[in-house]
């Protein structure tokens, strides 16, 4: 059994177009190093998967919480499809082992980079939608995401920066700093990378469509680090 057969068995779906599945796990760095192979990266599938994920999660929340206000559903959806949550979902189904990376990206630790794993999860959703249809996407989410919603994991939408401050300042005074590490993407679709530093130690990194979202993402990763020690 090769890795793609193993992956299909793991997720419980057979792909009619296995090349589409491979593309979902192909980072641009791999494409740059294998130009003669005529392979495609997963960026377009990520774009599609992002939209499919928002639709399916929105539909689930709409039906599960018939009396919930639009604003609250919007906050819940944002918590579900944010980068830290997507990384958690990707790790739960062991997606990192299947990612195709260039040698440089591999050496730089790309296989465990949060933004990369989040992108792979979205690109897989895009590929699954194209190959198997929306019903199979829902079936997959019924295993990976919807049980967490049912358990109430996202009912309390949190300001992660405030929560982090409350956690680290319980016993002592500390200095919390946020740094914007850089930005990527075109002007109309930028992504920002941020890190949070507590008393000189980097505790979390994250990214987002705005600087504030990136800082919130970094704070959420820091909280996960502190609460799982």
Curated annotation (Swiss-Prot):
GO cellular component: cytoplasm
One example of a Gene Ontology biological process annotation: mRNA processing
Annotated TM spans: none
Pfam families hit by this protein: dsrm, Ribonucleas_3_3
Binding site for Mg(2+): 46, 119, 122
InterPro entries per record: dsRBD_dom, RNase_III, RNase_III_dom, RNase_III_sf
Active site, per annotation: 50, 122
CDD domains: DSRM_RNAse_III_family (cd10845), RIBOc (cd00593)
NCBIfam families: RNaseIII (TIGR02191)
Oligomeric form and interacting partners: Homodimer.
Protein's name according to its UniProt entry: Ribonuclease 3
